[in-house]
Amino acid sequence: MELLPREKDKLLVFTAALLAERRLNRGLKLNYPEAMAFITMEIIEGARDGKTVAELMAYGKTLLSAEQVMDGVVELIHEVQVEATFPDGTKLVTVHNPIN
């Protein structure tokens, strides 16, 4: 199977997000890459489910709390930008201050 670089990147993010989800379920705090991957995957999957850009921008702020990430991660993530595929095309979703 041949995958484009963009498709490989999406699979890598998805794999990291699954690991992050498992760690969250075990009560572990996420590090920076895990938190970014988790938020990114949820936005991509939300777009696939038919949510709007505005809905995903709001949803992205509800995914993680400061208690769910390691010290310093909140200060590192000021915004998350994701190119997601919607039913009407690819759009950029930006979530400002995603971890409360």
UniProtKB/Swiss-Prot annotation:
Cytoplasm listed as a keyword: yes
Reactions catalysed, as given in the entry: urea + 2 H2O + H(+) = hydrogencarbonate + 2 NH4(+)
Matches recorded under Pfam families: Urease_gamma
Compartments it resides in: Cytoplasm
Metabolic or biological pathway: Nitrogen metabolism; urea degradation; CO(2) and NH(3) from urea (urease route): step 1/1
The family this protein is said to belong to: Belongs to the urease gamma subunit family.
Assembly notes: Heterotrimer of UreA (gamma), UreB (beta) and UreC (alpha) subunits. Three heterotrimers associate to form the active enzyme.
Protein's UniProt name: Urease subunit gamma
Species per Swiss-Prot/TrEMBL record: Marinomonas sp. (strain MWYL1)
Gene name, Swiss-Prot/TrEMBL: ureA
